[in-house]
């Protein structure tokens, strides 16, 4: 036994080198039944990607430009000289559509009407009746389809950058947030629930309440949360000088909204254009009423609205026209009332979240001292408390600063903010 043990120790000190059979055997360990086919597919993918890179010739760069060594300025200059500018026209009719000898009637503004054919680079399926096209100046052949003409002021209403307001920044509006999410988010995220029940999802919300209760703030939170296109319209923007301009802007606004996959249109201060119709004998409000009637028609008229959600905000719902408020146009009316004690406490905590405050400040006590206050009033209290700390050259805000601010804003400004007119706004 001792001799065998010594032999094992010698083998460990002088290990035998592996031959090719041993190496091949070790390579088979850990291989699954599909290892060979996976390797084959990986090799094919590698070869195909190499082939694609060879065909492209230029790798994508951050600037979108090729390397200077691959620039061909002479041919680019020649191409720019040969390429002629196109003229804008409108295709009014298609003769013999879906055939090889299809012809197109185009109307070139202030010149004439022509019957023309298609250019070499245009597909017949790209051209429809009524759309704008680009035609050359010699044969007037259609060279390119153009997007619909939309007023730049309407295009600028689209909110490109998402606001930094979230639902957590809206205090005292728990019930209102739930109602808003049911209308805006649920149909976009889970449309199958409405299909199973066989009902159409609500498409419009009217937010009404006293000034400063968070109507526009909640709309900004909706814009932050959703991935849909968000269009913000202020009511006074649609009141134009010339007859028909406001109605045209509304038409183009909804035309742009229908071209998006999903869209939310927010009308702020809608009482500027949505007032009840009446005859004042002068006719000064006729244009505003035409604009409102165009909105009424676009919301639920002859044509379907599509996947467009409409939010409206006002603090004077009693002045709005009944045709605008009927279900189908605005399905839900969400009231933003004055926040209760719990809501005011939450609003205090939201506004002091970024402030340097002392610990153990009794926000519930401060909320009790601000009865019948809106969220805007409480924000003003927090700002005024910070001003007291700056005056005293302190780096933190104390509870006494908040109490002084409450006395100044809530008690001192009472004649401005808590008038009976605002308390019984409706």
Curated annotation (Swiss-Prot):
GO terms for biological process: proteasome-mediated ubiquitin-dependent protein catabolic process. ATP binds at residues 209-216. Keywords: ATP-binding, Cytoplasm, Nucleotide-binding, Nucleus, Proteasome. It holds the Pfam family AAA_lid_3. GO terms for cellular component: cytoplasm; nucleus; proteasome regulatory particle, base subcomplex. GO terms for molecular function: ATP binding; ATP hydrolysis activity; proteasome-activating activity. It comes from the Eukaryota. SMART domains: AAA (SM00382). It is found in: Cytoplasm; Nucleus. The 26S proteasome is involved in the ATP-dependent degradation of ubiquitinated proteins. The regulatory (or ATPase) complex confers ATP dependency and substrate specificity to the 26S complex. Belongs to the AAA ATPase family. This is 26S proteasome regulatory subunit 7. It comes from Spinacia oleracea. The gene is RPT1.
């Amino acid at each position: 036994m001792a001799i065998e043990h010594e032999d094992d120790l010698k083998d460990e000190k002088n290990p035998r080198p592996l031959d090719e059979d041993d190496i091949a055997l070790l390579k088979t360990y850990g291989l699954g039944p599909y290892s060979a086919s996976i390797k084959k597919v990986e090799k094919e993918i590698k070869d195909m990607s190499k082939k694609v890179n060879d065909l492209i010739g230029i790798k994508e760069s951050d600037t979108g430009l090729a390397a200077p060594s691959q620039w061909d300025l002479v041919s680019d200059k020649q191409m720019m000289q040969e390429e002629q500018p196109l003229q804008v026209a409108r295709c009014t009719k298609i003769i013999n559509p879906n055939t090889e000898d299809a012809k197109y009637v185009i109307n070139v503004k202030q010149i004439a009407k022509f019957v023309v054919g298609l250019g070499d680079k245009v597909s017949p399926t790209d051209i429809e009746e009524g759309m704008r096209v680009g035609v050359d100046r010699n044969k007037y052949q259609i060279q390119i389809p153009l997007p619909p003409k939309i007023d730049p002021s309407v295009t600028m209403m689209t909110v490109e950058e998402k606001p930094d307001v979230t639902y957590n920044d809206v205090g005292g509006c728990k019930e209102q947030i739930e109602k808003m999410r049911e209308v805006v988010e649920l149909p976009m995220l889970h449309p199958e629930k409405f299909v199973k029940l066989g009902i159409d999802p609500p498409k419009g919300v009217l937010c009404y309440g006293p000034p400063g209760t968070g109507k526009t703030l909640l709309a900004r939170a909706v814009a932050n949360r959703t991935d849909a296109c968000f269009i913000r319209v202020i009511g006074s923007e649609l009141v134009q000088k010339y007859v028909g301009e406001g109605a045209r802007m509304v038409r183009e606004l909804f035309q742009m909204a229908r071209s998006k996959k999903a869209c939310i249109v927010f009308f702020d201060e809608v009482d500027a254009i949505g007032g009840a119709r009446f005859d004042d004998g002068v006719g000064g409000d006729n244009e505003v009423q035409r604009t409102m009637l165009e909105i009424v028609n676009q919301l639920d008229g002859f044509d379907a609205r599509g996947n467009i959600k409409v939010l409206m905000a006002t603090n004077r719902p009693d002045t709005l026209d009944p045709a605008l408020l009927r279900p189908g146009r605005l399905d839900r009316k969400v009231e933003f009332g004055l926040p209760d004690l719990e809501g005011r406490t939450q609003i205090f905590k939201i506004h002091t979240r970024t402030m340097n405050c002392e610990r153990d400040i009794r926000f519930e006590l401060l909320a009790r001292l601000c009865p019948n206050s809106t969220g805007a009033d409480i924000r003003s209290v927090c700002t005024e408390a910070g001003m007291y700390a700056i005056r005293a050259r302190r780096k933190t805000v104390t509870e006494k600063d908040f109490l002084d601010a409450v006395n100044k804003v809530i008690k001192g400004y009472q004649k401005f903010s808590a008038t009976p007119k605002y308390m019984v706004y409706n």
